Curated annotation (Swiss-Prot):
InterPro entries tied to this protein: F-box-like_dom_sf, F-box_dom, FBL60-like, LRR_FXL15/At3g58940/PEG3-like
Top-rank taxon, per record: Eukaryota
SUPFAM superfamilies: F-box domain (SSF81383), RNI-like (SSF52047)
Name this polypeptide is given: Putative F-box protein At3g58910
UniProt cross-references to Pfam families, sorted A to Z: F-box, LRR_At5g56370
Length: 214
């Protein structure tokens, strides 16, 4: 007997909140009732369950992807219109896949990226709805741009990028910046007649268009 199908939505949502992503996926297969749209928050520990659920969940509000997942599986067919919070932890992606992620999340307000590996040279965070952005220890070899006109909070702890071509922070209220300069960047900065400035937090703040408080 399928008892899951007879449960009220509120009770079923409460029960699902205690299950792992794997258990939720298995429950959806065993039940005659479509329970995937009831899920509000999901953590994807492995790629197999990520690709399975992301294509089905249209009402997802919070999503966390981690554990070394390669985001190259993300396709233009994925659309998460209600997603408010996205956490990317220890994932890899190419720039082409990363850039189609934002149009797929038109309501995204909070983005956290930790231990990210960018496979291509340049990357851009572009979102008109984004209000909170936290970046911690991403790995890339090129420039990093911000096209986030409604961003209110920026937390940026990382190595200095080669360049910041675009820094759209029209409504930024608070920024916490903690950056590390590589040995190669220091050597180039110290070279005679070199126009590449030695980066520090003040310099990066100016390049990003952020006025630091005294």
């Amino acid at each position: 007997m399928d008892r899951v199908s007879s449960l009220p939505d509120e009770l079923l949502c409460h029960i699902l909140s205690f299950l792992t992503t794997k258990e939720t996926a298995l429950t959806s297969l065993l039940s005659k009732r479509e329970i995937i749209p009831l899920i509000k928050s999901v953590v994807f520990p492995t790629l197999i369950y990520a690709s399975f659920l992301v294509q089905l969940v249209s009402k997802l509000v919070k999503l966390k992807i981690g554990s070394g997942i390669d985001l190259c599986w993300w396709t233009e067919s994925i659309f998460l219109p209600m997603l408010k919070t996205l956490v990317l932890d220890s994932v890899e992606f190419c720039v082409a896949r990363f850039e189609i992620l934002f149009p797929a999340c038109p309501a995204l307000e909070e983005l956290e990226m930790a231990n990210i590996k960018v496979l291509d040279s340049d990357a851009t965070v572009s979102s008109a709805s984004l209000k909170t952005l936290k970046i911690d220890s991403s790995v890339g070899s090129g420039s990093f741009s911000f096209d986030t006109p409604n961003l209110v909070y920026l937390g940026y702890s990382d190595f200095v990028a080669e360049d910041y071509p675009l820094a759209n922070f029209q409504n930024l209220f608070e920024a916490r910046i903690n950056l590390v300069v590589t040995k190669d960047q220091i050597e180039r900065a110290r070279a005679p007649n070199n126009g590449w400035l030695e980066d520090d937090e003040d310099d990066i703040a100016l390049r990003l268009g952020i006025r630091k408080s005294s």
